[in-house]
């Protein structure tokens, strides 16, 4: 079994970093439609996400802004990837993770692939379902904190988001040790 893992929210100043791990049950017929989630329009991501969820074993892991502040974003990202894999509860012979660094995963072979979310189908799939899940989470937070425009900025440090922080203050879900806060 081959597993792909990716994260989303690393560059955000609000909310968790979220990782997904994906193992296809069998090679899906939509494989050629997969791409890095950042390159896909929202509607296409959501469509593919539903197909991925139907045709794969998958798991997610979120690491809160509180933990990010304690262990830093790099370590939090690796922990999210490790936890997503552990949550799968599968023994994979090969695990691909997006990026330069390998999390602590007990699999026969674990490889970090730079730009893996554009190269490895399982990482592409993980990228898509992670982005869709985190975007939906930000949409829910937007209902609670509408002045911060989270539906639009998804927690990233846009000009509007930074202006909202200046005007309304830092929320408990902001990553307080990020330089932009």
From Swiss-Prot:
Gene3D superfamilies, per database record: Ribonuclease H-like superfamily/Ribonuclease H
GO molecular function: manganese ion binding; RNA binding; RNA-DNA hybrid ribonuclease activity
Cofactor note: Manganese or magnesium. Binds 1 divalent metal ion per monomer in the absence of substrate. May bind a second metal ion after substrate binding.
UniProt entry keywords in alphabetical sequence: Cytoplasm, Endonuclease, Hydrolase, Manganese, Metal-binding, Nuclease
Catalytic activity: Endonucleolytic cleavage to 5'-phosphomonoester
Example GO biological process: DNA replication, removal of RNA primer
Pfam families linked to this entry: RNase_HII (PF01351)
Family annotation (InterPro entries): RNase_HII, RNase_HII/HIII, RNase_HII/HIII_dom, RNaseH-like_sf, RNaseH_sf
Binding residues annotated for a divalent metal cation, in chain numbering: 6-7, 98
EC number: 3.1.26.4
Domain RNase H type-2, first and last residues per copy: 1-181
Compartment list: Cytoplasm
PROSITE patterns (UniProt xref): RNASE_H_2
Highest taxon of the lineage: Bacteria
Cofactor(s) listed: Mn(2+); Mg(2+)
Single GO cellular component term: ribonuclease H2 complex
Chief location category: cytoplasm
UniProt keyword Glycoprotein, yes or no: no
The protein's role, per its UniProt record: Endonuclease that specifically degrades the RNA of RNA-DNA hybrids.
Family listed: Belongs to the RNase HII family.
Protein name stated in the entry: Ribonuclease HII
Organism: Borrelia garinii subsp. bavariensis (strain ATCC BAA-2496 / DSM 23469 / PBi)
Underlying gene: rnhB
């Amino acid at each position: 079994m081959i597993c792909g893992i990716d994260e989303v929210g690393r560059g955000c100043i609000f909310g968790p970093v979220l990782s997904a791990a994906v193992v296809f049950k069998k090679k899906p017929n939509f494989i050629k439609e997969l791409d890095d989630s950042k390159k896909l329009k929202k509607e296409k991501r959501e469509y593919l996400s539903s197909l991925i969820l139907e045709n794969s074993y998958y798991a997610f892991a979120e690491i809160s802004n509180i933990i990010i502040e304690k262990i830093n974003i790099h370590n939090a990202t690796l922990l999210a990837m490790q936890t997503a894999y552990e949550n799968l509860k599968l023994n994979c012979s090969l695990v691909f993770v997006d990026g330069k660094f390998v999390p602590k995963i007990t699999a026969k072979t674990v490889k970090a692939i730079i730009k893996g979310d554009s190269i490895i189908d399982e990482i592409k799939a993980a990228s898509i379902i992670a982005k869709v899940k985190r975007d939906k989470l930000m949409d829910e937070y937007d209902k609670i904190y509408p002045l911060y425009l989270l539906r639009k900025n998804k927690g990233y440090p846009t000009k509007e988001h930074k202006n909202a922080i200046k005007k309304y203050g830092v929320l408990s879900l902001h990553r307080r040790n990020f330089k932009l806060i």
